[in-house]
Amino acid sequence: MGSQIRAQIEAQLKQRILLIDGGMGTMIQGYKLQEQDYRGERFADWHSDLKGNNDLLVLTQPQLIKEIHHAYLEAGADILETNTFNATTIAMADYDMESLSEEINFAAARLAREAADEWTAQNPAKPRYVAGVLGPTNRTCSISPDVNDPGYRNVSFDELVEAYSESTRALIRGGSDLILIETIFDTLNAKACAFAVDSVFEELGFALPVMISGTITDASGRTLSGQTTEAFYNSLRHVRPISFGLNCALGPDELRPYVEELSRISETFVSTHPNAGLPNAFGEYDLSPEEMAEHVKEWAQSGFLNLIGGCCGTTPEHIRHMAMAVEGVSPRVLPEIPVACRLSGLEPLTIAKDTLFVNVGERTNVTGSARFKRLIKEELYDEALDVAREQVENGAQIIDINMDEGMLDAEACMVRFLNLCASEPEISKVPIMVDSSKWEVIEAGLKCIQGKGIVNSISLKEGKEKFVEQAKLIRRYGAAVIVMAFDEVGQADTRERKLEICTKAYRILVDEVGFPPEDVIFDPNIFAVATGIDEHNNYAVDFIEAVADIKRDLPHAMISGGVSNVSFSFRGNNYVREAIHAVFLYHCFKNGMDMGIVNAGQLEIYDNVPEKLREAVEDVVLNRRDDATERLLEIAEEYRENAVGKQEDASALEWRTWSVEKRLEHALVKGITEFIVEDTEEARLNASKPLEVIEGPLMDGMNVVGDLFGEGKMFLPQVVKSARVMKQAVAHLEPFINASKQAGSSNGKILLATVKGDVHDIGKNIVGVVLQCNNYEIIDLGVMVPCEQILKVAKEQQVDIIGLSGLITPSLDEMVHVAKEMERLGFDLPLLIGGATTSKAHTAVKIEQNYSHPVVYVNNASRAVGVCTSLLSDELRPAFVERLQADYELVRDQHNRKKPRTKPVTLEAARANKVAIDWQSYTPPAPSQPGVHVFDDFDVATLRQYIDWTPFFLTWSLVGKYPTIFEHEEVGEEAKRLFGDANEWLDRIEQEGLLKARGMCGLFPAASVGDDIEVYTDESRTHVAKVLHNLRQQTEKPKGANYCLSDYVAPKESGKKDWIGAFAVTGGVNERELADQFKAQGDDYNAIMIQAVADRLAEAFAEYLHERVRKEIWGYAADENLSNEELIREKYQGIRPAPGYPACPEHTEKGPLWELLNVEETIGMSLTSSYAMWPGASVSGWYFSHPDSRYFAIAQIQQDQVESYAERKGWDLLEAEKWLGPNING
């Protein structure tokens, strides 16, 4: 029965967008019913007021409800919702009508069924369906109604299950085709509802399709209980609904970004039924049917929708206009979502094959933390919450909670603590791992978490029947599961037994229970080593090897383990224990371990373990020698406790005798801050009001600065220093201005932002400073700013211009998105485009055509003032815009008519013309020091010697090559001053440790396979750790090869044992914090200086490390002796191409690099959603050693290569085109 209905509805959904009906309450209000209408004859003498009990009307006014159903069906609705929003026993208790719940649900379904059947009979080609509605109730299972007791709940999970079960049975008996769980503001309520619905389906022997619809309550983009859209989706994905959607609380305008997100992440059909706008001052909804239809049409055309309907304030007319709006528009096509474990707290956590190691915080476990156990025993729950909070702050992405202690009521403690965690967003943002050896404690915990958590753990030790029973319940609760390698015989202690038990459990879970394989997490048992018992010596090796076996044989399953178990023999010596954990995890991660239960605040870095200790630990962990335990014990005790001022002469201070107005001008032009506060105060005392100081001498001085800069007589570093002086003066005046309620005038208000996914902002900061110097008010939103935030702030602050910045190529697509959204939302502000990756051609061809108001490419800071002046001037703007549009038209025309200088070739032909290397006569050099090497807090004095200063001067718009720039007639003196300031900063960085440089590199066995490169786990070359995907030049090359990076690595079939290197370095640890401090002080000069110096240190680190790799670590050029200039000119053997740059332009290839090196866990560098590196002052890439290797640019590729790349990466074509866009021909 249920499967036939689902197949029928799915077939309809693939053909067209289906219509859900609109607001039931809105229509009932239109009848203006009185108390007696609600009572009817049956309830005439009921003891409480019944007006407002809309669900009761299915019994007292059935014809009225049926009339409303008919009106919606006539308007075009395909799906009718039953009038049961508040019909559960819990909600009906407000009227003392709990006993009527079943009858009301049945009657409501029957009324809707009759109406639907009448319309289906009239037109069988358009069948009508009934959705049995299960509303949210008036209670919240994950939020306390008592602000004084955040752990209190006024309804339990079990009470909700009981209420929803009764309603579900009645809705099905009454004739519902679907079950709609809607208006979900507390996800835990919805999980209880879904649990009830699935239980009833099992009881009845068939399942109806389930629709789920949540409610984003406000502009925060979260449900009332705090979840983001994706976290909410992950929490209920286990229901496998026919549709996932959003409804109520917001109108279509406000709801749009969340529907868009849902359409992107949902693997099932997407529905939405928004309100008719937001309620006005009288609680009424103002959005007309025509206006709402316009929104709906745009959503449909954007590919967001499969089902559309209405909620509060909507009527049959709204549905009629929606039906007309979506008629003929193709429904959203279901996307292919990569297989991944998708967990959630208040925020999502996706663990995919390219995710780095996941830390599970272990300190909220009474069996593993004496402090936590004491706090729970003494009922000091607030302090116990601090333990959880510390784990998250220290990097735990999941927290494991265990209350198994003989003197505790584990079930009560688990419930109390989880309820309190739910009230702490800093804790509850991460998923929860419910950990207990008692099934009743696990179930109690699952009934408290609204997100998708993990059960730790179940096993086969009590036999298959118990195992299956528990697994089915875990799946119904919507959790992932850890499965211990434990059966009736006992715990698996050998490699073979671990694989045998895990395979058996996997087949039962996946094949019989229907458990998603990506939600199965095996714990193959980590046992203590170095116990003195010979049989235990190989325990770590068995685990490490079993990890590789399980990852190979059991698709999508993950591996976890309690890491501290391995070092239990050394309890009391934390330093040695941490060293054992570091070594053990290093080898486990290389073999594919996904997560581990660890103390997130005490993870040691593998390469930071002293060499003597590390070697002894490796002997133990890898069981390399018979006396390994004795040797480690001998040295363990050694580690038990380890755990500018220049004196101004009289002539230089002559300006101090001038008038205060002239002193202020001089200070601004020269960038002198020493006397600015006292001079500003003197000027204030002389003025009739504080604002006169800004609009008088200060702006006069800044006008001089602007004129000198425009004439090329002042340079950018000087202008930034001037801005610092101006900001300090204004900061002194602001309290006086505020006190007198004065408001100054500016030339205009400009919003600047680095777009979502991008972390680079030096150029944006410089533009902001230059504009401030010319009396523009700047609102700087910083980096990684989402489109909706940019446009929201622009509206709220009523800005005059929006400026977007970005460095990496994915930022170009985000800029196009912002332009489209500005057009859709009716903005008429000018849009400025800037950043290293932008260009006039891209702006003209890709961005400007999506926005009908001025879009201006600004290629440097000095041009920004003139552009803004022209755009905001009534006199200058028309001519400026006319010239701009003519210029862009010319650029587009040239782009369209441009004949490629080179002829494209097929991918097959390009591959046939690969670099010709005689591999048989070449022996690839084996590295002297294979593996991963970490350089933490590296010596800045060493890096200074490798700095290439020429780009540093370009950052400040001083053009010239170092060191000859110092002799330049115009910019030489300023370059010298800038160079001096930079070196003073480098001195401070060395002496005070203000910036940290961290880096790492690794050398791995590798072989090329076509255009890709296989990187192996070890020198046996039997297991592939990662595949690096490369692009090949695809233009005709009569005299040369069509280069691809894989050409420089020995082919697999050659039998040659080649290697590849990877590196990641940063010079910017603490850079953002320092820069922000200076900005807060109004010191833009030093804020930009620290970023520029950090950038240079990162590039210098990359240069230094490559040299060291060539000479020592790989050692293929041990005799190399090059000057810094020769290094800059790349006179060495080998190359270090970086993902995102010409030879390998596709940014997602940074992901495998991060995983091979374990970058984020080891040195703290991370990747944004657009694969920009954080900190911004970072460099990463690959090392190739072949003497013929050279840099090249991929340039334009053809469709056949796009398709090949997509197939190799496991992407659909749209995903490939998104990331390869800048390189796709045409």
Curated annotation (Swiss-Prot):
SUPFAM superfamilies: Cobalamin (vitamin B12)-binding domain, Dihydropteroate synthetase-like, Homocysteine S-methyltransferase, Methionine synthase activation domain-like, Methionine synthase domain. Its EC number is 2.1.1.13. GO terms for biological process: homocysteine metabolic process; methylation; tetrahydrofolate metabolic process. Residues 6-326 form the Hcy-binding domain. Residues 898-1226 form the AdoMet activation domain. Keywords: Amino-acid biosynthesis, Cobalamin, Cobalt, Metal-binding, Methionine biosynthesis, Methyltransferase, Repeat, S-adenosyl-L-methionine, Transferase, Zinc. It comes from the Bacteria. Zn(2+) binds at residues 248, 311-312. Residues 747-882 form the B12-binding domain. S-adenosyl-L-methionine binds at residues 948, 1136, 1191-1192. Pathway: Amino-acid biosynthesis; L-methionine biosynthesis via de novo pathway; L-methionine from L-homocysteine (MetH route): step 1/1. GO terms for cellular component: cytosol. PROSITE patterns: ADOMET_ACTIVATION (PS50974), B12_BINDING (PS51332), B12_BINDING_NTER (PS51337), HCY (PS50970), PTERIN_BINDING (PS50972). Binds 1 zinc ion per subunit. Residues 357-618 form the Pterin-binding domain. It is an enzyme of class 2 (transferase). It catalyses: (6S)-5-methyl-5,6,7,8-tetrahydrofolate + L-homocysteine = (6S)-5,6,7,8-tetrahydrofolate + L-methionine. Methylcob(III)alamin binds at residues 695, 757-761, 805, 809, 861. PANTHER family: METHIONINE SYNTHASE. Catalyzes the transfer of a methyl group from methyl-cobalamin to homocysteine, yielding enzyme-bound cob(I)alamin and methionine. Subsequently, remethylates the cofactor using methyltetrahydrofolate. Modular enzyme with four functionally distinct domains. The isolated Hcy-binding domain catalyzes methyl transfer from free methylcobalamin to homocysteine. The Hcy-binding domain in association with the pterin-binding domain catalyzes the methylation of cob(I)alamin by methyltetrahydrofolate and the methylation of homocysteine. The B12-binding domain binds the cofactor. The AdoMet activation domain binds S-adenosyl-L-methionine. Under aerobic conditions cob(I)alamin can be converted to inactive cob(II)alamin. Belongs to the vitamin-B12 dependent methionine synthase family. L-homocysteine is bound via the zinc atom. This is Methionine synthase.
